[in-house]
């Protein structure tokens, strides 16, 4: 009986040892998997920059609020206290009003119907609103010339309400989606860097591009005397600023087309899916390693106590 008991104890001890070795092997494999398949290997900052570059066409149109829109508005008739610089507030009002509608009515309704707008389609929608805003600026420019030629008068600054409101709606779709995707797909340790990279692609790169674009199209901003002083209606009427707006329209439409391309849509979706899978994968952190060591220690102590008994 004694030998049988010792043999049984040895069997249980051997089985327990094998079980512990199997568990330790699984834990090591899990740690190796987490270290090789972590988020850092899934998405890099270069990928974030490429993702954010998809909204550059919209942001080129968006940057016109502080440049060509102001130039156009400077030759328009003020409406009470509202002049060209004050019209920038229309963009903020648009973001607040339509942001509430889109965030609290449209998106919840789409979620209720289980409809998800792909990220690139949000970029395309934003770029489309940017193109519509530039289109309204083109119409306004033609109206400025028509009224000046017919009556020699300036048109109301309220004509610029449409471009500012439309660019604000586009900002809700394009810019907010860019910030969201840059933050969600970035590795946990690089989210701040990814947000900074996205901020550069949203605000920095488009502004640099606009500087070069303006210098290349400088002749369109000259009056009949060849001077860049077009803040008077007569001088503005002799310039060709509308050609610059048409170029911006083409750039914004290019952004729409690119974001609607199936390969671009599938690539962005694959990046988002890879980032989501990386989040689900356990990460080898100091806390996890500490917990694993403690579990091994507890099992070792429990096994020793069993053998002593």
Label each residue range with its predicted role.
Residues 1-284, 288, 295, 309:
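Hydrophobic transmembrane alpha-helices of multi-pass solute transporters/permeases
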Residues 9, 301-305:
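Long, low-complexity Q/N-rich tracts
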């Amino acid at each position: 009986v004694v030998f049988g008991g010792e043999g049984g104890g040895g069997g249980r001890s051997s089985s327990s040892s094998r079980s512990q070795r199997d568990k330790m092997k699984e834990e090591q494999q899990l740690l190796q998997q987490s270290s090789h398949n972590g988020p850092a290997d899934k998405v890099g900052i270069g990928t974030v920059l490429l993702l954010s570059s998809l909204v550059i066409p919209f942001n080129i149109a968006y940057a016109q609020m502080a440049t060509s829109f102001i130039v156009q508005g400077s030759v328009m008739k003020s409406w009470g206290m509202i002049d060209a610089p004050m019209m920038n507030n229309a963009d903020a009002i648009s973001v607040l009003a339509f942001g509430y509608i889109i965030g609290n009515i449209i998106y919840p309704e789409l979620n209720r119907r289980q409809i998800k707008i792909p990220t690139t389609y949000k970029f395309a929608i934003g770029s489309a609103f940017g193109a519509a805003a530039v289109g309204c600026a083109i119409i306004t420019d033609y109206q400025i010339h028509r009224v000046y030629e017919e009556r020699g008068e300036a048109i109301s600054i309220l004509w610029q309400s449409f471009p500012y409101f439309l660019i604000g709606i586009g900002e809700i779709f394009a810019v907010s989606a860019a910030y969201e995707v840059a933050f969600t797909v970035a590795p946990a340790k690089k989210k701040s860097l990814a947000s900074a990279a996205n901020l550069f692609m949203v605000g920095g790169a488009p502004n640099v591009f606009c500087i070069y674009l303006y210098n290349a199209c400088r002749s369109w901003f000259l009056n009949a005397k060849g001077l860049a002083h077009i803040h008077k209606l007569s001088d503005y009427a002799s310039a060709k600023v509308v050609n610059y707006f048409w170029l911006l329209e083409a750039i914004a439409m290019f952004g729409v087309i690119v974001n609607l391309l199936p390969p671009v849509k599938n690539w962005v979706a694959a990046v988002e899916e890879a980032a989501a899978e990386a989040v689900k994968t356990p990460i080898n952190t100091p806390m996890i390693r500490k917990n694993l060591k403690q579990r091994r220690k507890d099992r070792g102590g429990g096994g020793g106590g069993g053998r002593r008994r």
